[in-house]
Amino acid sequence: MTRNIAIIGGGIVGATAAYYLSRNGHQVTVFDEGTGQATSAAAGIICPWLSKRRNKKWYRLASEGAAFYKQLCKDVQEDGGDASFYTVSGAVLLKKTAKATQEQYEIGLKRREDAPEIGDLKILSKEELTTLLPSIQTQENALYVAGGARLDGDAMVREL
């Protein structure tokens, strides 16, 4: 049964909801003021797995959201669209001490059991870090997360 559905807000959440509802045959109208978009302001870093926030509900939401992008990209491509708005590029987490870097590494290993999209984790030497990011010359403690990604929210909204 086709329904007429109104969505308030055309950022990444509203656009994604509209995309999937339309994909399932519903008539969708998106209402959006177009100013003050969080989607446009966000850096688009997708790497929630190493957060030290104690809020388990937040972590679950963020982690499952990160995992969802793979399916969204697959669906967009199946529909003949361009999913280049999402790129798995890896992420580098900088820490002040080797101990803090090791702690983050251990958190990542544990969380990877339930979130394989984290990918490989590697504590970087200073030389590896400066090779990867030449503009960082004074940092010595870093953790590489292969599954870290970048989302261009504006491009995603336009594509959906």
State where each predicted segment sits.
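Short beta-to-alpha linker loops that shape the active-site pocket of alpha/beta-hydrolase fold enzymes
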Residues: E33-G34, W49, L160
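Helical element adjacent to the flavin cofactor pocket in flavoenzyme catalytic cores
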Residues: Q137, A142-L160
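Short beta-strand/turn micro-motifs composed of small residues
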Residues: G9, D32, K95
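Glycine-rich FAD pyrophosphate-binding loop
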Residues: S22-A42
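Alpha-helical scaffold segments in soluble metabolic enzymes
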Residues: Y20, F68-Q71, E159
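Dinucleotide-binding Rossmann-like beta1-alpha1 core, especially the glycine-rich loop
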Residues: I45-E128, L132
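N-terminal Rossmann-like FAD-binding beta1-loop-alpha1 element of flavoenzymes
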Residues: R3-T29
